[in-house]
Amino acid sequence: MIKVAIVDDSAVVRQVLSSMLENQPDITLLGCARDPLFALKLFEQQWPDVIILDIEMPRMDGITFLKKVMAEKPTPVVICSTLTEQGASVTIAALAAGAVDIITKPKLGLKGFLEESQARLLQAIRAAAKASVAKLRVNGLAKPMPVIAKHNADVVLASTNHALNQTTDRVVALGTSTGGTHALEYVLTALPRTSAGIVVVQHMPEHFTAAFASRLNGVCEMEVKEAEDNDRVMPGLVLIANGGKHMLLQRSGAQYRVQLKDGPLVSRHRPSVDVLFRSVANAAGKNALGVIMTGMGDDGARGLLEMHQCGAITLAQDEASCVVYGMPKEAVKLGAVSRQVALDNIAEEIIAFTKQ
């Protein structure tokens, strides 16, 4: 049974989130607190397995509380954030401080949105409960997701079984979820500006990916930006898929460009790693390197298999270094992986691939 605590200064939000946890056979609500100081008193009685945390609260802000939790008893924390530019920036800082995931505050009175919010909340809690927080590489720097139906990536992109044109450009595709913001920062900050162009899907709600890309851009030698439709993939550039849209790689003559598409959730996500990887298999073939990293579920496993079958080098982050060994595990089970590597070694694999 996953014991959950909610820390939010809004009584309405606490009530709505609490109601979303009712009747879940594997989740129990340990309690709610209106600010971090009340939360710490609550935790004296019993410590939760997962904490749902607001950022802006009286008496102690969420990031200060988060750092205190991580110092005293590292615990999976899911940030419950507002959809504002300022909220996004602070939320990304919270991820850097050790939080494992983001959910957006539910829009009250909108039944469809509440149902979507509940699905995302439960998914985040179950993933967080499996997270090995001690494995986070924390540097200490400071559209609603539609529900459920598990679509095949064919609903977003056409079949990839046709002949590949040749091009000399190299492309690196990275896919990750829970724990991935820390892992991506760890890898990308180790890469020189001369590295091959990189396309990334990190499971994250829309409105947050721009702030995440901006943060990475401030600490990486490579340029990092949120992808825009028709952006060219170039050496020295990292394109982060927008939250709420699928990102595909396409060939345009001798160039690679990205296309952003709406569409249903694929493998329960949008953006989907499967959609990106399958498009990379189609567009780049053996000129690509695919890396599936920490995260829960199976998104990306089939797409990595198609990359493998098209001659790409395919890597999976190993279990010992994953915060959640889910997506890499499923890819290994499918036979999609050339080899498993530790997080410490992923950057050098990308550098070696660039020099080939």
UniProtKB/Swiss-Prot annotation:
- Is Phosphoprotein there in the keyword field? yes
Q: Which GO terms describe its cellular component?
A: cytoplasm
Extract the Gene3D superfamilies matched here.
Answer: 3.40.50.2300, Methylesterase CheB, C-terminal domain
- Keywords, comma-separated and alphabetical: Chemotaxis, Cytoplasm, Hydrolase, Phosphoprotein
Question: Which residues are catalytic?
Answer: S177, H203, D299
Example GO BP: chemotaxis
Question: Does the record's keyword annotation contain Phosphoprotein?
Answer: yes
GO terms assigned for molecular function: phosphorelay response regulator activity; protein-glutamate methylesterase activity; protein-glutamine glutaminase activity
Of which family is this protein a member? Belongs to the CheB family.
**Official protein name in the record:** Protein-glutamate methylesterase/protein-glutamine glutaminase 3
User: Which species does the entry assign this protein to?
Assistant: Shewanella oneidensis (strain ATCC 700550 / JCM 31522 / CIP 106686 / LMG 19005 / NCIMB 14063 / MR-1)
